[in-house]
Amino acid sequence: MLPRIANQRAIVDRRALADAVSAAFAEQGDRSRPAVVELLRGALDSGRAELARRLEARPSAGTECAHGQAFLVDQLVRVIHDHVVGKVYRASNRSTGERIAIIAVGGYGRGEMAPHSDVDIAFVTPIKPTSWCEQVIEAILYFLWDLGLKVGHSSRSLDEVVRMAKSDLTIRTALLEGRYVWGDRDLFDAASARFWNEVVNGTEKQFVAEKLQERNERHKRLGDSRYVVEPNVKEGKGGLRDLHTLYWIGKYIHKVRDASELVDVGLLTAEEYRAFRRAENFFWAVRCHLHAITRRAEDRLTFDLQREVAMRMNFADRPGKSAVERFMQYFFLQAKQVGSLTGVFLAQLDGQFARQKRSFFASLRSRRKKVGPFFIEGGKLGVPAEDTFQQDPVRLVELFAVAASEKVEIHPEAMRLARRDAGLIDAAVRKDQRANALFLDVLTSRNDPETVLRWMNEAGVFGRFVPDFGRVVAQMQFDMYHHYTVDEHTIRAIGLLASIEKGEAKADHPLASEVVGKVASRRVLYVATLLHDIAKGRRGDHSVLGAEVAMKLCPRLGLSAAETELVAWLVRWHLLMSATAFKRDLADYKTIADFVNTVQSQERLRLLLLLTIVDIRAVGPGVWNSWKRQLLGDLFVSAEEVLRLGHKQHGRAERIIAKKKAVGAILKERDNLIGTVGRQLGDAYWIAEPEDIIALNLQQMDQALGELLSVEAHWYPARGATLVTVLAADHPGLFYRIAGGIHLAGGNIIDARIHTARNGTAVDNFLVQDPLGRPLNEASQIERLKNAIADALANRVKLVPQLAARPLARPRADAFDVRPIVIFDNKASNRFTVIEVGARDRPALLNRLARALFEARLIVHSAHIATYGERAVDTFYVTDVLGEKVDSEARMKAVEKRLLEAAEDRKVKDAA
């Protein structure tokens, strides 16, 4: 039965609607159908409008909106049924078999619907449906379909209902929430009685096991974290479906009719039930807003919708945190609460089954083993008494330290008590030496720190013990780059670090796996990983603010002054290595020298490499790739050589000789090319390019002698990209035209080096991937690349309009406000001016920027492209036409203006 709906007739007046339908039929008879549909549609539209008005007036009243939607559909179904049975297929003398019960099932049965939810209906008949029953059911369905409702329906006899419910979990779950809507009430009661007696009775344990398995598979399918930044409100981890699962299990086992009765049967406390209702109401509000905004059954809270839902639900900006970030933080806190409720619910369930002589989870209950103030029983860590933590709040930290050292799960009842008593952690506990030592044991555990820290976070102990961490719990970053909340990202980074240390990541991270064994201070590395994003969401640079947090927190954790200083340095500079590797020219010695000048020691270099890798990896799937691994490895090796040899490192001439020798080893019997075509290439080329690319370039130059244009493309596994080499007569605008051709072929340039041989031939090397970071390695893709470049250079295509028409690989980037920025740096290189342009990522951005540089009469010598979700950062090493740096203020202002115009989101007329 639905809860009482306030002012029902403002939503729909069933009697008035039924009278209007009857009047239409009386007037038009069999020709009345269009008029009846129009009346019904009008009632549906006005009902939806009234519910939308109520949601706008009370934007957090989610369950009220959901019940209102179900009420509206109920009334329409009743009017349609009475019209069909009483007028369209009126039967004066029906047999006992000509009876129909209309049962709402699934979410509709529960009385909870979003504006565009499916309408799930079961038509039940006493025996196999007669022709009259079939006609009535079909007519009812056609009316519902004509209203534009998406109807899920079944038509079965009583026996079929029972038989199918026994064999199909989905049908059983749907019928579990079966609710009488209209029709034959006695038939509904008979179906309900048989369902409980013949289907449910004796299958409770099987149902629970199947529902939990179904839940786990759903989580895995949707991203097994409740902190995915574009969550599915209905199906995602910690969402509505998880709450429904608890209700289904409670109903199946204890026959509860409402979630409030979960308290009466001992599965939730009154306080936990209030948390259940709070989360449910909030998620229903979000879901109803999503349907209202999109006008469809949209349950995914995507970036473009998050801002609007936050606004509708009256979230406002606060210093350092936008309205959408505050809204999403509240969302994730509710999802976290659902996870906690699930744990305690299942713990109580386990206990109830255990009291029936056998544990539900079938764990053999061995003799208790005492561990400090706790015990281990059945492979789980438990607490002996309700007041265990109240006696000594330090035990709240000790619980997790014991779980880490003993490699055991924490019993859900112990988690429940820890969650309840987390508030006992005060300033005295935080200062306690033993508590801090225990926390450090968890953080630096050689077993599984990620899992235990996640438990600690779920219980609320982590954020209470480290309040700065508590500030980033459930905090999202409103961008497309970070896939997880800050706390989840941090915990994952710690887990990745532990995995590298155990040698489990050698294939993916050979350098890191080798370096980790040379690190002098594990504690520094783990604490720095914990703190690297600790100041996210505050006003100011989170790296600088995080270093300040480290200086205060590390001594409390028991770190020495030297360790504290090193942690603070790592937090302050945790973005330095990736910024240098991905946005600077590693072949320019000044890049390495500047980097080393900041790093200053091999220990810092090792620690920074490891922190950088786990930070990038923990951002989310698809962010790490072999190209990034190669760049970080190149930077590490170059920096380590400078730190190790200092001024004794090889000079420019010696490095070129060594490079030529290495190239000769690759070319083997063709090593004569070094002295023939290789003569055309200057020293800068030999220093900049790696040996394997030089070998390929020399062979291509030899084969292309006398040709006006040569384009080659090879799959380049070492870089995780396709190497595209273009040989052509050098002329102004060559670079932007090549870039345009590559973009037209579906390529995304991630790195480019531009050289001019002594004979005037341009030797340009590009590393190319598809827009999703994958290589273009199929024969058809490579052929398309070659043809597109040739067409662009021959002016056979109008680049700009064609590029502008290409769809964006990441269309959701439009949800973000990315203001273009241009930065000039004349200190980053001895020979070149370095220009860094940040802008919204979109098709052919590089082409636009390169064209702007060409129009500003600048020569591009190398380009380095990095993307961070919706934001692209393109870095160019340039000179003027005379080979000089751009250093006049007026010139820089003029170039900046051109680049900002090119970076703007607007259509550009083709002048190519």
UniProtKB/Swiss-Prot annotation:
Domain notes: Has four distinct domains: an N-terminal nucleotidyltransferase (NT) domain responsible for UTase activity, a central HD domain that encodes UR activity, and two C-terminal ACT domains that seem to have a role in glutamine sensing.
Ranges where the ACT domain occurs: 723-802, 834-912
Organism whose genome encodes this protein: Novosphingobium aromaticivorans (strain ATCC 700278 / DSM 12444 / CCUG 56034 / CIP 105152 / NBRC 16084 / F199)
Gene Ontology molecular function: [protein-PII] uridylyltransferase activity; phosphoric diester hydrolase activity
Record-linked Pfam families: GlnD_UR_UTase (PF08335), HD (PF01966), NTP_transf_2 (PF01909)
Protein family according to the UniProt entry: Belongs to the GlnD family.
Uridylyl-removing: annotated segments: 370-722
Regulation: Uridylyltransferase (UTase) activity is inhibited by glutamine, while glutamine activates uridylyl-removing (UR) activity.
Protein name: Bifunctional uridylyltransferase/uridylyl-removing enzyme
